[in-house]
Amino acid sequence: MVQNIVVIQGAAMDKRGIEQVEIFGPETLDEINARIEKDAAALDVSVQIFHSNDAAEVVEFLRGLDQTQYIAGIINPSGFTIMDTQIPDTIAAMNFPFYEVHGSNPAKRGVVSKVLPSCAGSVWGFGHAGYGVAMGAILQSRETA
């Protein structure tokens, strides 16, 4: 059985590798997504990656998913982390758990995520390897459930 995970790349992720490289690193969004796909393949997981700078588009995308096809979701809310959007409520209403991932540690910069309370867990501070860490943890937690 194929295990599917949806990955949401939030606002300003398309600026990765261009802006604030000292915080977020030199990898572009395309490079980050390629790494996610490589890590997923190594775990025998299928990923669907979606990016938008518009919170309403993210909500519309999530509401349009066939929720029976996914075991989990991963979100790097990026610019949506501290914004008041419908994303947290939409995530909370999903039939599968979501996990928040950040390559850096937002708390180190005093950032408090408005998305995290709707998530089952989080992975912060491992660079873009955090997506693979999250996918591995999702699979392990399903084995022990």
Please identify what each model-predicted range represents:
Residues 1-5:
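Extreme N-terminal starter segment of soluble prokaryotic enzymes
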Residues 11-13, 78-81, 104-106:
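Short glycine-rich anion-binding loops that position phosphate/pyrophosphate groups of nucleotides
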Residues 15-31:
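Glycine- and acidic-residue-enriched helix-capping/strand-helix junction motifs
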Residues 48-57:
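Short beta->alpha junction loops
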Residues 107-145:
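Short, glycine-/small-residue-rich phosphate/pyrophosphate-handling segment
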